[in-house]
């Protein structure tokens, strides 16, 4: 915990030296600042999680990340773990972690999930996966759509480029309540609603 609050100001300074970060929609974060929520960003670069952490560093988060994120290099792997990153491998232990995360959200913690499941290719948004909405339904928390845009010709991350981090209007928890685990119609509607919101965030 102490190490987190030492590292994040350092990361904030380093990231603001390396990139021109512009945050939009802070008022939407204020709507969920007193309760648990899930932040659901688009995914372009391996370092996308850091942009979310440094633009909301006052609230410690649980970060769901694929194992590839921990394989970039040892230093980044250590940093991500210090920031609360949980490696997603699909193991039985992960089920326990998810249960603990759901309970943490109920207790007021913020969860960061990249719903696309992998990084975008050729500036094309990918449809969000269902896991985000299942967790939101179990925890009973709002989902905050987020889009990360790199102002470069190909939309890829480049050092010293302008980076827009846009937070949208929270999607209310009541929207995710499901009558049963196989309520596919509602899942499809929520996935499309999030994708449509991302498209409008330009």
Predicted regions and their residues:
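A generic structural signal for well-ordered alpha-helical segments
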Residues: 14, 56, 80, 104, ...
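Non-catalytic C-terminal accessory region of glycerolipid acyltransferases
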Residues: 96-202
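Catalytic core of membrane glycerolipid acyltransferases/transacylases, capturing the structured
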Residues: 31-92
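Alpha-helical membrane-targeting segments
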Residues: 1-20, 71-83, 156-162
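Short, basic, glycine/proline-bearing loop/turn elements
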Residues: 14, 82-88, 115-118
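Structural signal for hydrophobic
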Residues: 23, 79-80, 143, 167
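Helix-to-loop junction immediately C-terminal to a conserved catalytic motif
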Residues: 4, 11-43
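Glycine-rich, highly charged phosphate/nucleotide-binding loops
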Residues: 20-24, 92-97
